[in-house]
């Protein structure tokens, strides 16, 4: 695929993002209304797309995706753990700051850019399962783990943590992650396919597609709005998070894919899924803990801008 072909492929995607940026930057949306757009994508449109995609996939086809699932777990959760250890023991961050920094370096905005970018390359139906698996990894494993570690760091500083409260907090974090539509919808759908070999009737697919088909455009617009309403204040931690997200993590995923022996198309999917900009959700978790709020918000914007350069390069090298 030539550079011109790639730019033509990505042009509609970046056009909608830029349109969203104008809407956010010039006041058509504020933080509250932008959250409403994001909620439409993450709690309704994308879960509907996942259900329709997974429940029209055969059990054998689903099982063929297992190596890709393993790669995504290692490439996302494993990367988080590596950065966490580096921050904690080399840069001497406290545990909470280490967890926040690592989460923002590891969590991609797959929910907003996965369908438009990967769908343009492989077709929307072909990428439903990889994106759904990423949703489970992020919402049911990564976010709860990061929240638990950050909370332990806060509690240990205050010397208030007890065994009971730790396990209660752990259970609540995992349960919250599993209850998120981005995790619950694909997880339940996968169980229906793997255990019961269930296939959704055509009428059900059409009903879900009425909402799921809106995912691409609305999701990209939401990314642009989110970037547009944020202010940028460059710092070394912000630049570091952005570079880890769009350059280092995709490179690590390439090595993981080679080690596991993924075929070329799955390698491209795995690399692109982690190469997307940092996640606004991860930046919100930083705000929750009142740690590196400015840095993570800036990193989100910077990584989104850098992805305009990195994504075409990655597609040219792998697709």
From Swiss-Prot:
Location(s) in or outside the cell: Cell membrane
Gene3D superfamilies linked: 1.20.1530.20
Keywords, comma-separated and alphabetical: Cell membrane, Membrane, Transmembrane, Transmembrane helix, Transport
GO biological process, alphabetically ordered: transmembrane transport
Predominant location: membrane
One family name in Pfam for this protein: Mem_trans
Transmembrane regions: 3-23, 36-56, 66-86, 108-128, 129-149, 181-201, 209-229, 238-258, 267-287, 299-319
Protein name (database record): Uncharacterized transporter YwkB
Gene this protein is translated from: ywkB
